[in-house]
């Protein structure tokens, strides 16, 4: 007799509406207090949805004073701090991209924020926090936040 084994990854998922940048800042600041070495945050959303804005607020919440801007053309920006921030924009990549060695940062002891994460999904750890940002108006955004493993409790804490 043969047996087939499979695993199911369970995730905690919530949906939130942020009315403006102040709400976005409050959410990112709350999240910044729960970061740990090896934290992986995946961001998805249309152009202009607020992925980089969220990352700026997250960095400020971490105490980073450098200007945080989009790494669209550089792929990766590193902000050194007590807990380093590795900010990636992988929109232009298909797969991990051998020239960039991004896995070195994804699995490092800092905080890794990845915009357009679906382009390198197969290179990501099973446990991660995913935030999908949808535009609902000039300033309003609908966020779907999903976490697996260690990130499930963080999702619960963000459910305000």
Question: Over which residues does each language-model region extend?
Answer:
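Walker A (P-loop) phosphate-binding loop of P-loop NTPases
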Residues: 48
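Conserved lysine of the Walker
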Residues: 51
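N-terminal pre-Walker A segment at the start of P-loop NTPase domains
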Residues: 11-28
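Conserved nucleotide-sensing/catalytic segment adjacent to the nucleotide-binding pocket
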Residues: 78-118
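Hydrophobic anchor at the beta1->P-loop junction of P-loop NTPases
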Residues: 41-43
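Short phosphate-coordinating micro-motif centered on Lys-Gly-acidic
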Residues: 14, 60, 105-160
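Short beta-strand-centered segment that lines the nucleotide-binding/catalytic pocket of NTP-utilizing
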Residues: 64-79
């Amino acid at each position: 007799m043969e047996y087939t084994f499979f695993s199911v990854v369970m995730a905690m998922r919530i949906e939130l509406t942020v009315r403006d940048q102040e709400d976005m800042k409050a959410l990112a600041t709350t999240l910044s207090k729960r970061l740990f070495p090896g934290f992986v945050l995946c961001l998805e959303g249309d152009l202009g949805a607020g992925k980089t804005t969220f990352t700026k607020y997250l960095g400020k919440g971490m105490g980073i004073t450098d200007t945080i801007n989009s790494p669209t053309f550089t792929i990766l920006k590193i902000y050194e701090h007590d807990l380093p921030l590795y900010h990636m924009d992988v929109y232009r990549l298909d797969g991990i991209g051998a020239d960039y060695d991004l896995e070195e940062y994804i699995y490092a002891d800092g905080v890794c924020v990845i915009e357009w994460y679906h382009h390198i999904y197969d290179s990501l750890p099973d446990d991660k926090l995913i935030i999908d940002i949808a535009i609902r108006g000039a300033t309003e955004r609908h966020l779907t936040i999903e976490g697996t493993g260690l990130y499930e409790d963080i999702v619960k804490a963000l459910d305000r």
